[in-house]
């Protein structure tokens, strides 16, 4: 038997050896395998010949060689070498974050995550990127960041060969193949493949909009939507077309634009096999087969929601397009625009054509008139391949084909 003083000395010895241990094994047994003998028993790993003073440490070592992970999460079936790792993991599902920062009360599910966070308050950022000079509190964060410079994506999906820079992104991607959705909303029981998706969804119940614009005070539930909104104020358009160098604020807008160059029309109507460049155009077209939008006053149906809205104004006697100088109102915006043109007939015509001295209110009208003299027909109909001038009906015909 050991006295309390001897046991205290042993614990001190373990802590000291733990701090200077040159081995690269799991931290849970580093301090154990470095001690040759305490109570007279030595446990040796047959694979790597390391010696341990505790049988548990030997078992942990052997699992690193065999790949055995006996502890399984019953929520997502992920497996672990140690029971303590399983307990830490289960906090993700239970939303349990027992490690709280004393400075800002932010909570974490793992003590290592808390340690990394606390460095931000202490101003300690030990890990610096040698390419851009950015500092990080944890070496793992630096490693992931450096992949943004190198383009390295070491995590490969075995199903579709897609690569990722983060292991968490790969885990989330795999769920698109398995259909697994481990994160469930307690309010409506809707399930999600990613925790961030669940958090965003929960804000629909709470009404929380944590991302607020300091320019116009508009707020958002999603960080991605907030980033896109800020570009309205900054004018930033980071997504550039390689074919014509046109820039866009959103990646989705760039993808749609690029189809102008490639001719790709990925959205196909299963009724008539007609294809479209945008999903919104397909949805609008599909309504022509079903007559989706119905008036509640009459049994009249419409292909587009906008047509139904205009029709309903007849019942409500609503005329939203109001002339500022009198009480005249219009159901349709196009009627309002036509009236504006009539009222400005006597006003100055700014755009004059030098060949025939004809003048116009708008530059677009002047450009359209020029084609009468030049004979140019720059717009080609995709069906008949006829050349078209820029006139309202023909322009509409050309746009409907995309």
From Swiss-Prot:
Keyword flag Cytoplasm: yes
Zn finger region (C2H2-type): 43-65, 71-93, 99-121, 127-149, 155-177, 183-205, 211-233, 239-261, 267-289, 293-315, 351-373
Iron recorded as keyword: no
Subcellular location: Cytoplasm; Nucleus
Keyword terms of this UniProt record: Activator, Cytoplasm, DNA-binding, Metal-binding, Nucleus, Phosphoprotein, Repeat, Transcription, Transcription regulation, Zinc, Zinc-finger
Cellular component per GO, a single term: centrosome
Record text on subunit structure and interactions: Interacts with POU5F1.
PANTHER family: RIKEN CDNA 6720489N17 GENE-RELATED, ZNF44 PROTEIN
Family recorded in the similarity comment: Belongs to the krueppel C2H2-type zinc-finger protein family.
Protein's recorded name: Zinc finger protein 322
Organism: Macaca fascicularis (Crab-eating macaque)
């Amino acid at each position: 038997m050991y006295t309390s003083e001897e046991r205290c000395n042993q614990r001190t010895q373990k802590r000291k050896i733990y701090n200077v241990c040159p081995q690269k094994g799991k931290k849970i047994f580093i301090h154990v395998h470095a001690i040759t003998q305490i109570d007279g028993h030595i446990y040796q790993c047959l694979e790597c010949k390391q010696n341990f003073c505790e049988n548990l440490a030997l078992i942990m070592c052997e699992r690193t060689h065999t790949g055995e992970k006996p502890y399984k999460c019953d929520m997502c079936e992920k497996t672990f070498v140690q029971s303590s790792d399983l307990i830490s993991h289960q906090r993700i599902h239970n939303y349990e974050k027992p490690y709280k920062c004393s400075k800002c009360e932010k909570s974490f599910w793992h003590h290592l995550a808390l340690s990394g966070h606390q460095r931000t308050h202490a101003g300690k950022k030990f890990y610096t990127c040698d390419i851009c000079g950015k500092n990080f509190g944890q070496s793992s964060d630096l490693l992931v960041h450096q992949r943004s410079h190198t383009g390295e994506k070491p995590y490969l999906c075995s199903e579709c060969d897609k690569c990722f820079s983060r292991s968490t992104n790969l885990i989330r991607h795999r769920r698109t193949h398995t259909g697994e959705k481990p994160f469930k909303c307690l309010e409506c029981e809707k399930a999600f493949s990613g925790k961030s998706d669940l958090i965003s969804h929960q804000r629909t119940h709470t009404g929380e909009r944590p991302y607020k614009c300091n320019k116009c005070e508009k707020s958002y539930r999603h960080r991605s939507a907030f980033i896109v909104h800020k570009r309205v104020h900054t004018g930033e358009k980071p997504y550039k077309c390689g074919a014509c160098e046109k820039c866009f604020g959103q990646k989705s807008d760039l993808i749609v634009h690029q189809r102008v160059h490639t001719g790709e029309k990925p959205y196909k109507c299963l009724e008539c096999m007609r294809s479209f460049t945008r999903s919104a155009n397909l949805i609008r077209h599909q309504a022509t087969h079903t007559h989706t939008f119905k008036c509640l006053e009459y049994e009249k149906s419409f292909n587009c929601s906008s047509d139904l809205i205009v029709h309903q104004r007849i019942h409500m006697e609503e005329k939203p397009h109001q002339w500022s100088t009198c009480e005249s109102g219009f159901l349709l915006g196009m009627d309002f625009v036509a009236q504006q043109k009539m009222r400005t007939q006597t006003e100055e015509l700014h755009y004059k054509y030098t060949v025939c001295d004809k003048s116009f209110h708008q530059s677009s009208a002047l450009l359209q008139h020029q084609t009468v003299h030049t004979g140019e027909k720059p717009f080609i109909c995709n069906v008949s391949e006829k050349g078209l001038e820029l006139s309202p009906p023909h322009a509409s015909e050309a746009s409907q084909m995309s």
